C-alpha cells in the first residue's frame, strides 16, 4: 500500500492488484482512501474519478497490467521468480518497472555483541509475523566465543513463544498464509535434516481452527554449511544458524547468496560495524547495526540488490521513480545561444 501512496503523491492514478492470497488488506486500505477522498470532496475539493482502483483476481489480472501499454510504470512485490517473468515483459514494451523481490536476510552476532539486546532483536526478526515478511531474518552467523551461551537462550525463547490466534492477547505467532507455505516450510526442514542440520521446532500446532489453518512453531536449524535450503528464501519461520570464528568468514557467508535485501550486525566493535556498512561488508540494500533486518524502514530507501531486484521505495528519493522527468530549456531573449558556444550563422 505504501507504493500506491507514493504514486498518488506524485500525481499518478493507481491500479492496485494485491496478491490473491491477501485481498482483504487491500480492500481495507482502499476503503480508508475512499473515506479520505469523501472528506476532501465534502470540503469542496475535486478528485478525478478512478484515481485509485483495486483489482481483485488471480495471475491473469496481473498479466494484463504487465502487458498493458497504458501502464507506463509497474511496481511489483513478490518472489524472484515473479520478477524474472515480469521485468522482461514490461521492458519488452519499453515500460518501466520497480521490482521488490525475495530476501534471504542474515544477521551476524560478533563476540562483542550485547547478547540481551541481540536476543530480543533476533527473536522478533526471525519469528515475528511467522517469518512472512520480506525482511524476516532467515540466516544467523554466531561467533564461536558466544555461540554456546547464546544459542541455548535463543532456543528457550523459541520454545516459550506463544502460537495461536493473533487477535487474542498474548499470542505472538499467527498462522502461515496457506497450505503451500506450510508445505514449503516442511520441505525446507526435510532438506536441512538431510544435510545433517539439527532442527529445533517446526511442528504444526492445533490452534482450534480446523485442518485448513496452518499454525506452526518457528523452527531453528543448527547447520554446519550454507548449502541447499539455506541459500533459498522460504517464506516461513525458519532460522538457519551457523557458527563462525573469523569476521571475514562471516562476511563471506553473509554475502554468498543470490538475494540482497536486508542485513544486520550485532556488535560493540566500531571497526566491525563500519566494515559491515562499507563496500567490504554487507552487499544488501539495507544494512543495520544492533537492530534486526526486519521492519518497514519508512524513513529510508527500501529495497535490495542482486536477485532482490534493485528497486527502491520510500525514503527521500522514492518520488523520483514515480515521475516522468523532463529537461526544459527556455530562451527569454532575442538572441539564440547554442550549446557549448557553437556558432551557426545563416542568412
Regions found by a protein language model. Give the residues of each.
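Residues that line or immediately flank small-molecule/substrate-binding pockets and catalytic motifs
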Residues: 56-59, 78, 144, 268, ...
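Rossmann-like NAD(P) dinucleotide-binding subdomain of oxidoreductase/dehydrogenase enzymes
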Residues: 1-117, 244
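Short, solvent-exposed loop/turn segments at the edges of secondary structure
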Residues: 2, 9, 101-104, 133-135, ...
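ALDH superfamily catalytic-core signature
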Residues: 35-36, 67, 81-225, 252, ...
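Residue-level detector of anion-binding/catalytic polar loops
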Residues: 13, 96, 198, 260-262
Amino acid at each position: 500500500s505504501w507504493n500506491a501512496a507514493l504514486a498518488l503523491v506524485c500525481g499518478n492514478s493507481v491500479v492496485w492488484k494485491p496478491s490473491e492470497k491477501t485481498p482483504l488488506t487491500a480492500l481495507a486500505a482502499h476503503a480508508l482512501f475512499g473515506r479520505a477522498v469523501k472528506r476532501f470532496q465534502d470540503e469542496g475539493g475535486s478528485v478525478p474519478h478512478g484515481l485509485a482502483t483495486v483489482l481483485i483476481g488471480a495471475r491473469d489480472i496481473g498479466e494484463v497490467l504487465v502487458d498493458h501499454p497504458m501502464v507506463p510504470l509497474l511496481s511489483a512485490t513478490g518472489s524472484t521468480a515473479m520478477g524474472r517473468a515480469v521485468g522482461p515483459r514490461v521492458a519488452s514494451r519499453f515500460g518501466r518497472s520497480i521490482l521488490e523481490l525475495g530476501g534471504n536476510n542474515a544477521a551476524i552476532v560478533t563476540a562483542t555483541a550485547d547478547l540481551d539486546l541481540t536476543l530480543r532483536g533476533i527473536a522478533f526478526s526471525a519469528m515475528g509475523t511467522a517469518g512472512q515478511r520480506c525482511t524476516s531474518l532467515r540466516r544467523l552467523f554466531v561467533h564461536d566465543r558466544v555461540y554456546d551461551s547464546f544459542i541455548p537462550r535463543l532456543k528457550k525463547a523459541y520454545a516459550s513463544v506463544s502460537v495461536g490466534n493473533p487477535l487474542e492477547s498474548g499470542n505472538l505467532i499467527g498462522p502461515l498464509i496457506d497450505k503451500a507455505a506450510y508445505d514449503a516450510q516442511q520441505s525446507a526442514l526435510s532438506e536441512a535434516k538431510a544435510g545433517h542440520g539439527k532442527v529445533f521446532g517446526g511442528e504444526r500446532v492445533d490452534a482450534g481452527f480446523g485442518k485448513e489453518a496452518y499454525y506452526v512453531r518457528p523452527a531453528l536449524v543448527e547447520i554446519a554449511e550454507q548449502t541447499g535450503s539455506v541459500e533459498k528464501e522460504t517464506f516461513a519461520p525458519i532460522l538457519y544458524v551457523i557458527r563462525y570464528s573469523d569476521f571475514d568468514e562471516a562476511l563471506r557467508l553473509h554475502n554468498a547468496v543470490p538475494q540482497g535485501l536486508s542485513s544486520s550486525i550485532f556488535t560493540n566493535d566500531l571497526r566491525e560495524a563500519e566494515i559491515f556498512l562499507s563496500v567490504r561488508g554487507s552487499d544488501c540494500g539495507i544494512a543495520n547495526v544492533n537492530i534486526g533486518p526486519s521492519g518497514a524502514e519508512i524513513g529510508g530507501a527500501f529495497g535490495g540488490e542482486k536477485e532482490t531486484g534493485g528497486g527502491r521505495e520510500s525514503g527521500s528519493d522514492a518520488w523520483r521513480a514515480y515521475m516522468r522527468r523532463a529537461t526544459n530549456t527556455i530562451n527569454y531573449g532575442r538572441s539564440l545561444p547554442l550549446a557549448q558556444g557553437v556558432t551557426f550563422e545563416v542568412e
